[in-house]
Design a protein with these regions (language model features):
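Catalytic cores of the polymerase beta-like nucleotidyltransferase superfamily
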Residues: 1-238
Length: 238
């Protein structure tokens, strides 16, 4: 029933640049094998593109990594991949992520989740079957855009509109989102540099300043990874 409602209320059928490029990713890379393996696993199983790859297609950037979301649980993802002889590893399985390896391509496949408990660094999650529930736990609207293999967008938080307008909007309460994971302060800066020519919202800056010390709770590995991404941002040096 949830998938039916998604198709009616939250999906947009596109025949434009975005749709065609997402279709090309499906048809011209081994991603089609992932879609076949998971979508055919059961009558209700489904996998969708999510996050950065869609954001980059919309902004006509080079897609250099592909993240996928699925309503299968991690052990079911493993079984679906085994059924099609697709290699994978389970290093992120505790957080719901299985990484499939096909030729030179890596695909991170993450089960739908909802947060049970957060501490500013990590979240304790519970797996879900609800796409809107998964979208609601993500950090920014521009990262909560999904697409099926045919390029039909599922965008419950109006992320495409925000991306087109250069609006970097937290999903839900900004302070709650930051306190769940203080890395989101740096992610906000990176996405703002990349995608916005607008002025910062004063309230957002107040909240960031109020919580800036939370960054000290983060591991050096996570901080270094985010700083590397920040320095590679299109607008980092203007």
């Amino acid at each position: 029933m949830n998938n039916l409602l998604d198709r009616i209320f939250f999906r947009s059928k596109n025949l434009d640049y975005i749709s065609q490029n997402l279709k090309d990713i499906t048809n011209q890379t081994p991603a089609n094998k992932i879609f076949e393996a998971i979508n055919n696993y059961s009558e209700s199983s489904e996998v969708r593109y999510v996050g950065g790859c869609i954001r980059k297609v919309i902004k006509k950037e080079t897609v250099d990594d592909i993240d996928l979301a699925t309503n299968l649980k991690p052990d079911e993802v493993c079984e679906a991949l085994k059924n099609k002889d697709i290699n994978f590893y389970e290093t992120g399985i505790d957080h719901g992520t299985v990484t499939a390896i096909i030729d030179k391509y890596r695909y991170e496949i993450t089960s739908l989740r909802k947060d049970i408990k957060t501490d500013g660094r990590h979240a304790k999650v519970q797996f879900s079957l609800d796409w809107k529930e998964d979208a609601a736990r993500r950090d920014f609207s521009i990262n909560s855009i999904y697409s099926d293999g045919e390029g039909n967008l599922f965008d419950p938080n109006n992320g495409k509109k925000d991306l087109d307008e250069g609006s970097i909007n937290f999903i839900g309460d900004t302070e709650d989102r930051i306190k769940e994971d203080y890395l989101r302060i740096l992610r906000y800066i990176r996405f703002f540099i990349n995608y916005s020519d607008n002025k910062h919202r004063p309230e957002t800056i107040k909240i960031i300043k109020r919580n800036i010390n939370g960054i000290s709770k983060l591991s050096s590995e996570r901080l270094l990874d985010e700083f590397k991404k920040l320095t590679k941002s299109n607008g980092f040096i203007k």
